[in-house]
Structures are given as structure tokens and as C-alpha cells.
């Protein structure tokens, strides 16, 4: 019967051969195509949002025919009035503003001036 030292050496050699065989098997397997996991696909982009179609919206609404026909013209007129009044306010003199609003809840002249300046900043 072989001695203990010889058995340990034989066991170590067998263990090293098994590890080498396992390593060789893994590297050979990794070289094959199709063994690696498939690549992660790129994220799919969200579906495109449907563009707002005003004419389609107006067809679906149950407005009177006159409103459906003239709503765009009325909206343009209102927008023009608002923009022109805001432009007029930008050129308005502070004294005219205060004269028109005298006695309408302003505590002092400075309070009225500060409110007027805040109003102009908003528009």
C-alpha cells in the first residue's frame, strides 16, 4: 500500500487535472456562438404622440355651426385685443394709472406705485 505522502501527491495531481479540464471545458464552451447570453436589446422608444388636430376636435364637438365656423376668427380678434391692451399698459403713465384708480383701495401713493409696477411685470 502506498504511503500517505504518495496518496496526497496523486490526489493533488488528479485535482489539478480536474481543474484544468473544467477550465478548458468552460473556455471552449464560451468560444462557441450562441452560448453567451443574448445582448440586451435597446429600450423601445415610446409610441409617437398623436398630433393635435384642431379641425378633428371641432368636428367632434357639439357646438352650433356658427361657432364652429367663426371660432378661429373670434379667437384671433380676442388675442389681438389682449395684446394691444397689454402694449398700451406698458406705455401708460403712472400718474394716469393712479388718477384712474384714485380711492380704489390703495393705502398710499407708494403702495399704488408698487402695485402698478407689479402689474407691468406680469404683462
UniProtKB/Swiss-Prot annotation:
GO terms for cellular component: host cell membrane; membrane; virion component. Induction: Expressed in the late phase of the viral replicative cycle. It is found in: Host membrane; Virion. The chain crosses the membrane at residues 5-25. It comes from African swine fever virus (isolate Tick/South Africa/Pretoriuskop Pr4/1996). Keywords: Host membrane, Late protein, Membrane, Transmembrane, Transmembrane helix, Virion. Signal peptide: none annotated. Residues 32-53 are annotated as: Disordered. It is a single-pass membrane protein. Residues 36-47 have a biased composition (Pro residues). Its main location: host cell. The lineage of its organism: Viruses, Varidnaviria, Bamfordvirae, Nucleocytoviricota, Pokkesviricetes. This is Uncharacterized protein CP123L. Belongs to the asfivirus CP123L family.
Amino acid at each position: 500500500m502506498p504511503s500517505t505522502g504518495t496518496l496526497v501527491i496523486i490526489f493533488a495531481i488528479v485535482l489539478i487535472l480536474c481543474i484544468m479540464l473544467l477550465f478548458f471545458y468552460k473556455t471552449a464552451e464560451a468560444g462557441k456562438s450562441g452560448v453567451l447570453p443574448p445582448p440586451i436589446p435597446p429600450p423601445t422608444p415610446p409610441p409617437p404622440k398623436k398630433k393635435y388636430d384642431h379641425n378633428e376636435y371641432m368636428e367632434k364637438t357639439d357646438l352650433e355651426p356658427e361657432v364652429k365656423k367663426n371660432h378661429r376668427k373670434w379667437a384671433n380678434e380676442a388675442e389681438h385685443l389682449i395684446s394691444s391692451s397689454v402694449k398700451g399698459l406698458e406705455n401708460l403713465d403712472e400718474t394716469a394709472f393712479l388718477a384712474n384708480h384714485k380711492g380704489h383701495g390703495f393705502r398710499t401713493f407708494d403702495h399704488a406705485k408698487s402695485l402698478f409696477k407689479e402689474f407691468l411685470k406680469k404683462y
